[in-house]
């Protein structure tokens, strides 16, 4: 059985890792949709789709998982979004999402949709991790070591801080 999960993964953190490990107990293969794939270099979406794929693949390389990271651009056309996703991915049997819109769209198309258990959502949040990066607070413990390495390699914290500057 193949499952599908989508997220922005800005950045990929330990909460995402725990959700994927849990899903792997229920399915044989996981399609990991990299949402908002066209977005990067903003405070909300600082990392490119390629950088996020690197974060995910490096974080999962020590786990015995079969997964497919697939970049998925936003199309702003909800009624056909599921068909769009299906056209980009291998077929899947079950969808994992806590997002109400994603849940409704897939349920309306006849998919079984499960709400994954969220892990420490207060700290394991991309918004919180990016806030900590901007403010010079500790964030490294909230992401897998591989993600720390990728963010250092791409100078991700420096990028985020430059993006936060104003022209005043």
Swiss-Prot record:
Asked whether the keyword Chloroplast is assigned, the reply is: no
Where's it found, cell-wise? Cytoplasm
This protein's pathway reads: Cofactor biosynthesis; NAD(+) biosynthesis; NAD(+) from nicotinamide D-ribonucleotide: step 1/1
Chief subcellular site? Answer: cytoplasm
Q: Give UniProt keywords alphabetically.
A: ATP-binding, Cytoplasm, NAD, Nucleotide-binding, Nucleotidyltransferase, Pyridine nucleotide biosynthesis, Transferase
Q: Which InterPro entries match?
A: Cyt_trans-like, NMN_Atrans_arc, Rossmann-like_a/b/a_fold
Q: What is its EC number?
A: 2.7.7.1
Name the Pfam families for this protein. CTP_transf_like
BP-aspect Gene Ontology terms = NAD biosynthetic process
What is the top EC class of this enzyme, as a single word?
transferase
- For ATP, which residues are the binding ones? 8-9, 13, 16, 119, 121, 124, 126-127, 130
Q: Name one GO molecular function term.
A: nicotinamide-nucleotide adenylyltransferase activity
- Could you name the Gene Ontology cellular component terms for this entry? cytoplasm
Reactions accelerated catalytically: beta-nicotinamide D-ribonucleotide + ATP + H(+) = diphosphate + NAD(+)
Which HAMAP family does the entry link to?
Answer: NMN_adenylyltr
How does it associate, per the subunit comment?
A: Homohexamer existing as a trimer of dimers.
State the PANTHER family in the record.
BIFUNCTIONAL NMN ADENYLYLTRANSFERASE_NUDIX HYDROLASE (PTHR21342:SF0), PHOSPHOPANTETHEINE ADENYLYLTRANSFERASE (PTHR21342)
What biological function has been recorded for the protein in this entry? Catalyzes the formation of NAD(+) from nicotinamide mononucleotide (NMN) and ATP.
Which family does the entry's similarity section mention?
Belongs to the archaeal NMN adenylyltransferase family.
Protein name listed in UniProt: Nicotinamide-nucleotide adenylyltransferase
Organism from which the protein derives: Methanocaldococcus jannaschii (strain ATCC 43067 / DSM 2661 / JAL-1 / JCM 10045 / NBRC 100440)
Which lineage ranks, top first, belong to the organism behind this chain? Archaea, Methanobacteriati, Methanobacteriota, Methanomada group, Methanococci
């Amino acid at each position: 059985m193949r499952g599908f999960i989508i997220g922005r993964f800005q950045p990929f953190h330990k909460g995402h890792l725990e959700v994927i490990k849990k899903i792997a107990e229920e399915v044989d293969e996981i399609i990991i949709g990299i949402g908002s794939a066209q977005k990067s270099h903003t405070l909300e979406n600082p990392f490119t789709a390629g950088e996020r794929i690197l974060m995910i693949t490096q974080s999962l390389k020590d786990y015995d998982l079969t997964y497919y990271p697939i970049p998925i651009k936003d199309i702003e056309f909800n009624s056909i979004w599921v068909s769009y996703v299906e056209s980009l991915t291998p077929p899947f049997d079950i969808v994992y999402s806590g997002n109400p819109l994603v849940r409704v769209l897939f349920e309306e198309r006849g998919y079984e949709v499960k709400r994954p258990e969220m892990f420490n959502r207060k700290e394991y949040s991309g918004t919180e991790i990016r806030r900590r990066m901007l403010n010079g607070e500790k964030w490294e413990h909230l992401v897998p070591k591989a993600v720390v390495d990728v963010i250092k390699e791409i100078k991700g914290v420096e990028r985020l801080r430059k993006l936060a500057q104003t022209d005043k």
